[in-house]
Amino acid sequence: MAQVGEIFLIALLFFTLVFVLNWIRLRRQVRPFRKYGLAVGTVLILFEIVSVVLFFESLRGVSLFSILLADGWTFIRLAAFTIVGTYYAWQSGHLAFPLLMRRFPVTPAAQSAAGSASPAASTAPLQPPPNGPPSLAGVNLTPPAVGEATPGTIRLDDQSPLPARENAAATLPVMEMPSRPSVTPPQALGATLIVVAGALLYTVVLFTVTTPRLSQIVRSLTDFDTAQLGLGSTVTLATLLLVLQVGFAEEIIFRLGIQNFLAVHFKWQGQRFRIAIAATAALWAMGHSGMLDPDWVKLAQIFPVGLALGWLYDRFGIESAILAHGLFNVAGLILTPSLIS
């Protein structure tokens, strides 16, 4: 399954470069979302610092310059996935951070500074559309002459999602609150716990029936590396923090970033968003190749979990997906010695 891992690494590198370049290319449009990216990047750096301190013995011999370089790249990468991913989420009709955005909303003034709201916009906080592409309310629609399409004109009979071109984000209207305000934090927490419990039950049954073993590659890794994979045999504060960090970063990259990127660029909004969920879950599962023997067991475990996390994001936002992933990783770390040879 080495080829699966290579394909995954190439795909991840591709998406990383795309998001970093889009952060630069769309800097005006994504400006209102920078605060979320800086917050996520800072949280990841704090995780990295604590992990380095706790795993100092395992990292002995690694130069300080290498650690600082890796941490700097981690900050840039996660900030790019957060900022651009939140922008794509906005376009696909999602509140990326429903709890955080209610506390720190994107205002019309911020979007006006990004060139995407009219000066006469309301002072109420901006919210994404109920489902799918944003409404045309507030957009200047100039119908072209019959049989003629004027550059920059929005055709009244054009059913393509907005913004359909890279300049269309500059004319985004003030958007309405999505039709999910009735979802309360207790409901989100309840759904999160149900997803975690279901994923753990499925994992226990699958591993009990198939009796997998750690692959030769994983057995040769250090405690720091195996903890990053959630396969360490020793549960300590260091390994717990590390699996939480991995879950946090993976949800930002896959569910917030790649999933919304696919939804926008392949027009998988609305009911078709489930296609983006499945595609992202498949890519995420490929990243876990080579951990167990036989290899298919890990893929069979991870793909359904990815579907559940994708649904959780779609329904309750990235905070719920991050919490579910973190709890699943912690529980998996505890259960690993009894489930895997």
Regions found by a protein language model. Give the residues of each.
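A generic, lipid-embedded transmembrane alpha helix
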Residues: 37-59
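N-terminal signal-anchor/start-transfer transmembrane helix
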Residues: 9-28
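Alpha-helical transmembrane spans of integral membrane proteins, capturing the lipid-embedded, hydrophobic core
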Residues: 8-15, 41-45, 78-83, 192-204, ...
